[in-house]
Amino acid sequence: MKRTFQPSVLKRKRTHGFRARMATANGRKVLSRRRAKGRARLSA
Protein backbone atom coordinates (compact mmCIF):
# COMPACT_ATOMS: atom_id res chain seq x y z
CA MET A 1 0.00 0.00 0.00
CA LYS A 2 1.25 3.47 -0.91
CA ARG A 3 1.85 5.78 2.03
CA THR A 4 0.01 9.11 2.17
CA PHE A 5 3.10 11.21 2.93
CA GLN A 6 5.38 11.49 -0.11
CA PRO A 7 7.81 14.29 0.87
CA SER A 8 8.63 17.05 -1.61
CA VAL A 9 10.42 20.23 -0.51
CA LEU A 10 8.95 22.27 -3.38
CA LYS A 11 5.33 21.27 -2.67
CA ARG A 12 5.89 21.83 1.07
CA LYS A 13 7.17 25.36 0.52
CA ARG A 14 4.52 26.28 -2.03
CA THR A 15 1.58 25.16 0.08
CA HIS A 16 2.77 25.81 3.65
CA GLY A 17 5.63 28.27 3.20
CA PHE A 18 5.86 31.81 4.53
CA ARG A 19 5.16 33.47 1.17
CA ALA A 20 2.14 31.23 0.62
CA ARG A 21 0.78 32.27 4.03
CA MET A 22 1.42 35.96 3.32
CA ALA A 23 -0.39 35.72 -0.02
CA THR A 24 -3.86 35.40 1.54
CA ALA A 25 -5.72 37.20 4.33
CA ASN A 26 -6.42 33.91 6.12
CA GLY A 27 -2.78 32.91 5.79
CA ARG A 28 -1.78 36.15 7.50
CA LYS A 29 -4.25 35.29 10.28
CA VAL A 30 -2.47 31.94 10.68
CA LEU A 31 0.89 33.73 11.03
CA SER A 32 -0.46 36.26 13.52
CA ARG A 33 -1.99 33.45 15.62
CA ARG A 34 1.33 31.60 15.61
CA ARG A 35 3.17 34.81 16.59
CA ALA A 36 0.70 35.39 19.44
CA LYS A 37 1.21 31.81 20.63
CA GLY A 38 4.97 32.34 20.56
CA ARG A 39 5.94 29.71 18.01
CA ALA A 40 9.65 29.48 17.22
CA ARG A 41 8.82 28.54 13.60
CA LEU A 42 5.96 30.40 11.93
CA SER A 43 5.86 28.39 8.71
CA ALA A 44 7.46 25.49 6.85
UniProtKB/Swiss-Prot annotation:
Alphabetical UniProt keywords: Ribonucleoprotein, Ribosomal protein
Any GO CC annotation of this UniProt entry: ribosome
InterPro entries: Ribosomal_bL34, Ribosomal_bL34_CS
Keyword Ribonucleoprotein: yes
Any one GO BP annotation for this protein: translation
Regions of compositional bias (Basic residues) in chain numbering: 10-19, 30-44
Region (Disordered): 1-44
Protein name, UniProt field: Large ribosomal subunit protein bL34
Gene: rpmH
